[in-house]
Amino acid sequence: MNIGIDMMGGDFAPLEAVKGVQQYLSNSEHTIFCIGEETLLKELFQQHGVSSPFLHIVHAPDAIGYHEHPTKALKEKPNSSIAIGFKLLAEGKIDSFASAGNTGAMLVGAMFTIKPIKGVLRPTIGSLLPKLEGKTGILVDVGLNADCKPEQLNQFAILGNLYAKHILNIENPIVGLLNMGEEEGKGNLLAQATYPLLKENTHIQFMGNLEGRDLFNDKADVIVCDGFTGNIVLKTAEAMYDAAAHQGLGNDSFFSRYHFENYGGTPILGVNKPVIIQHGISNAKAFYNMIKLSEKMIESKFCQIITSNFENL
């Protein structure tokens, strides 16, 4: 297993990335391809006493900044850590690629270098939602597709369902459509047109409409919405954590589960190989969990599972 990590992406990279890799390699025998400025990375790994036959540094002299145009930057910076990461992934030299760098560049690279799985209308990104009773759900889409068609939301439900089952280990995930009321026929035109598709979808267990007040209870494991709505929900949840932390509740058993560092990042669901995006302010723990999520997606053959399911639709 070869896991690719962009060591230059993130506000605190490459130092925190190095610490995350150090923590992972202390208890793993999977090879980590660390993509970044070779001299700097060697110096940092040496300073932290990291020496492992499973550590492989790939030199990338350039990096894509947060404010650079994704498509333009990937084209003009072929030697950037993100561009080289996608090249290695496309060539099969690594089995997954993850970064806390430029989100747009990661999305463009996934869409045009790795490409969507056959039959997937639009890949999606999801965010994990902590539940009050201790479970974890997933919200899809959270920003990749601001405007959606009903058929796309129907597929997001399938992709989220597969993720809940094979990555979150939820045996029989329940799918809900985020809406302004529980009754069938509620909502805007998109929600009204999506409901019957989800209701007739034999690949999921659809419970119906789900109101915003039920996001954090156990009514649904997979919550489906367009990316515009999902991104607002995600940012509101993040703001709720910040407010709780400001009030001294950051270590509360429930609110602490909102912290991004506890999760491995956001996978792009529906592309041919595992691609993971992590928060730009990632610390060592976040990088470590990003590597662990990469490992799980590879071991579970998650992308192959999606491919198989979409062949049978």
Residue ranges of each PLM-predicted region?
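N-terminal phosphate-binding or glycine-rich loops at protein starts, especially the Walker A/P-loop
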Residues: 1-42
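Short helix-capping segments at alpha-helix termini
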Residues: 25-29, 46-54, 168, 198-204
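Phosphate/nucleotide-donor binding subsite
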Residues: 50-94
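Glycine-rich phosphate/diphosphate-binding loop of Rossmann-like nucleotide-binding domains
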Residues: 15, 33, 39, 146-208, ...
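Glycine-rich phosphate-binding loop
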Residues: 88-107, 182, 186, 191-255
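Short glycine/serine/threonine-rich phosphate/pyrophosphate-binding segments
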Residues: 13-18, 79-89, 96-110, 121-125, ...
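Glycine-rich phosphate/nucleotide-binding loop
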Residues: 111-135, 139, 215-313
